[in-house]
């Protein structure tokens, strides 16, 4: 969707070139490994927007709409009621931001506000007050990065900065409202995905510009990285989430759009392909609620193709 270096492609050029030279493989998924079911769709189509869970509700801010415009709107999904509502819009529109929940708040880091360079600004959203508050900016402006919470701190990893694709890794301390730079990711990439399992942050896939199968894990306690088994299918523009101590990598983009759902088991350092997404997508959000994973929005074609799709995956137990 975004060419390395921050250049936003037009819809027609993006569709023609997509974002890599890898085509989705034709090998088959394992349909009996996990179950998918449809849930209530988003109120409006969007893509390039991660999501985050706070107290039984999934918050989906910003992204591109169906016309390819950057939006500031916030949609909120009540998991128990299977119903979407709108919340207070962000102070400014964002696409390709990092989104993470921490301490009952939703943090939005970086992203693009338009076709210009990446932003470093950070906001948090208070669900109880329905208010957005600016926080200290990231040291390095970035978009198409990942943002996760581990050990009470927020990590912003990889993405596109003003000089191109980076492996930058910065940590935010909410108590002091300060960022620090820690050990960089060994493989710089953007349009990557990440999830936390135990004391490690697993970072998977991405591109720079070709698609990566790379899986690397960051250990905050030792400020070090581990290189792990490659994902079977190299993908950028994917989403990831953890459930039952395993990592799941969904979708992605090449000249086509991936349906793939691949599972990584840290105990064996091994991958397997499980039940594919019913709707192939890229640039979506993935959020774990209980044992299930909700995969929300995203583009159904390479480039622009925002959708309202909300599908729930329940892994095997």
Predicted regions and their residues:
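C-terminal motif of bacterial Sec signal peptides marking the signal peptidase cleavage site
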Residues: 15-18
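Kelch-like beta-propeller repeat domains
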Residues: 20-317
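Bacterial N-terminal signal peptides that target proteins for export
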Residues: 1-8
């Amino acid at each position: 969707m975004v060419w390395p270096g921050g250049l936003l492609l037009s819809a027609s050029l993006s569709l023609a070139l997509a974002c890599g030279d890898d085509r989705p493989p034709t090998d088959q998924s394992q349909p009996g490994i996990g179950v998918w079911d449809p849930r209530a769709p988003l109120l409006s189509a969007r893509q390039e927007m991660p999501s985050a869970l706070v107290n039984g509700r999934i918050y989906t801010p910003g992204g591109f709409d169906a016309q390819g415009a950057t939006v500031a709107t916030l949609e909120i999904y009540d998991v128990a009621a299977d119903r979407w509502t709108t919340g207070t819009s962000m102070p400014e529109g964002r696409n390709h931001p990092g989104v993470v929940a921490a301490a009952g708040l939703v943090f939005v880091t970086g992203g693009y506000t338009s076709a210009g360079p990446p932003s470093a600004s950070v906001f948090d959203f208070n669900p109880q007050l329905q208010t957005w508050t600016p926080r200290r900016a990231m040291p390095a402006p970035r978009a198409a990065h990942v943002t996760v919470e581990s050990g009470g701190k927020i990590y912003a990893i990889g993405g596109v900065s003003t000089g191109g694709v980076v492996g930058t890794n910065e940590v935010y301390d909410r108590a002091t409202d300060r960022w620090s730079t820690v050990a960089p990711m060994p493989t710089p990439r953007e349009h990557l995905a990440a999830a936390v399992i135990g004391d490690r942050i697993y970072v998977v896939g991405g591109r720079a510009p070709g698609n990566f199968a790379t899986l690397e894990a960051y250990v905050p306690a030792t400020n070090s990285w581990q290189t792990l088994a490659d994902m079977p299918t190299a993908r950028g523009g994917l989403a990831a989430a953890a459930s039952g101590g395993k990592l799941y990598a969904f979708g992605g983009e090449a000249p086509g759009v991936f349906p793939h759902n691949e599972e990584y088991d840290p105990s064996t350092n091994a991958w397997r392909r499980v039940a594919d997404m019913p709707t192939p997508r890229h640039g979506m959000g993935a959020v774990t609620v209980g044992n299930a994973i909700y995969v929300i929005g995203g583009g159904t074609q390479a480039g622009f193709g925002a959708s309202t799709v909300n599908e729930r995956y329940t892994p095997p137990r």
